[in-house]
């Protein structure tokens, strides 16, 4: 059997095995979550772009995280919503492979962006006097471009290894969308090489970055405890705790899905964890950052004040 043969033309995403009434309820609920994801991240991105006081490295990285979260959710959620309302639940092979590629690309990029954000916090708190030199705009741009490039390059490697396999037999994917581990189960050949490369990638983008983040936050915690003023400690801790919440949610779920040995009993658990990754995590990120960030709340307040002023001026002109 040749490795470049692909015989199936479409794939069935089993998704949620629920009745029509519950499917409509879930579709409505996830539609609200998806709308909140786009709205929350869109507002954060817009405020950062429009408010000059937020043109700093920390918010530059946060704007890219918002872009990733919107893209991540948009890659997975619309098809999942369509499948809830459609009993057929099929997806063509090429769109499925594209969804797998983008899912991996955005996930890896987010891992690396979160590492960059932790490094930014480390420099800001532990080396405040050298911050503007170390975190220059040139360095920030290079870090962001490297994160995006590595994310898409690693995803491309996995897609090339995936497409060399023959897909000639089963067509049912027990998942909410096309995800690489689930799609690999459809292959009619040994997937050992793919599994090894996936595990190696997990070590590179999950274990390694998480270790760097934890080490950086150990130094950050030591520096925060040395801050003399109570206000300074609270401000530094609130900024870092927001990032730690996001890191804990993202890396914790990803490591359970991709690094815990697979079994048939875990398929439903992985489905729920992937749902959290695709729907809840991107929705919660802007909420976590905005609730604990005085500068973001201040920028939003200024934007609303400007809008009210413009309405007043427009009303007077009329």
UniProtKB/Swiss-Prot annotation:
Location in or out of the cell: Cell membrane
Extracellular side: 1-24, 79-99, 158-194, 259-271
Chain segments annotated as transmembrane: 25-48, 57-78, 100-119, 139-157, 195-218, 236-258, 272-291
SUPFAM superfamilies in alphabetical order: Family A G protein-coupled receptor-like (SSF81321)
InterPro entries per record: GPCR_Rhodpsn, GPCR_Rhodpsn_7TM, Olfact_rcpt
GO biological process, one term: detection of chemical stimulus involved in sensory perception of smell
Keyword NAD: no
Family: Belongs to the G-protein coupled receptor 1 family.
Glycan attachment sites: 4
Protein name: Olfactory receptor 2A2
Keyword terms, alphabetized: Cell membrane, G-protein coupled receptor, Glycoprotein, Membrane, Olfaction, Receptor, Sensory transduction, Transducer, Transmembrane, Transmembrane helix
Topological region Cytoplasmic: 49-56, 120-138, 219-235, 292-310
UniProt source species: Homo sapiens (Human)
Topological category with respect to the lipid bilayer: Multi-pass membrane protein
Example of a GO MF term: G protein-coupled receptor activity
Upper lineage: Eukaryota, Metazoa, Chordata, Craniata, Vertebrata
Cellular component terms per the entry's GO annotation: plasma membrane
Function: Odorant receptor.
Gene: OR2A2
């Amino acid at each position: 059997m040749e490795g470049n043969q692909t015989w199936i033309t479409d794939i069935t995403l089993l998704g949620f095995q629920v009745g029509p009434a519950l499917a409509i309820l879930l579709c409505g609920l996830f539609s609200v979550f998806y709308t909140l994801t786009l709205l929350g991240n869109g507002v954060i991105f817009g405020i950062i772009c429009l408010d000059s006081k937020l043109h700093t490295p920390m918010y530059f990285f946060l704007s890219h995280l918002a872009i990733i979260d919107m893209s991540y959710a948009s890659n997975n959620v619309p098809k999942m919503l369509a499948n809830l309302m459609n009993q057929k639940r099929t997806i063509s092979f090429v769109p499925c492979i594209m969804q797998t590629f983008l899912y991996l690309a955005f996930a890896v990029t987010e891992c690396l962006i979160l590492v960059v954000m932790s490094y930014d916090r480390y420099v800001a708190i532990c080396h405040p006097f050298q911050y503007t030199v170390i975190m220059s705009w040139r360095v920030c741009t290079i870090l962001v471009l490297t994160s995006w490039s590595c994310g898409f390059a690693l995803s491309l490697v996995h897609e090339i290894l995936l497409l060399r396999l023959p897909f000639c037999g089963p067509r049912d994917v027990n998942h909410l969308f096309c995800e690489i581990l689930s799609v690999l189960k459809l292959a009619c050949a040994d997937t050992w090489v793919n599994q090894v490369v996936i595990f190696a990638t997990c070590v590179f983008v999950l274990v390694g970055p998480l270790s760097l983040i934890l080490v950086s936050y150990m130094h950050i915690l030591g520096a925060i405890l040395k801050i003399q003023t109570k206000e300074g400690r609270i401000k530094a801790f609130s900024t870092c705790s927001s990032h730690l919440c996001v890191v804990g949610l993202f890396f914790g779920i990803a490591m359970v899905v991709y690094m815990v040995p697979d079994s048939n009993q875990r398929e439903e658990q992985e489905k729920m964890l992937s749902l959290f990754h695709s729907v809840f995590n991107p929705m919660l990120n802007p909420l976590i950052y905005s609730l604990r960030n005085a500068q973001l709340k201040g920028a939003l307040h200024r934007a609303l004040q400007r809008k009210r002023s413009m309405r007043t001026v427009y009303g007077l002109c009329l």
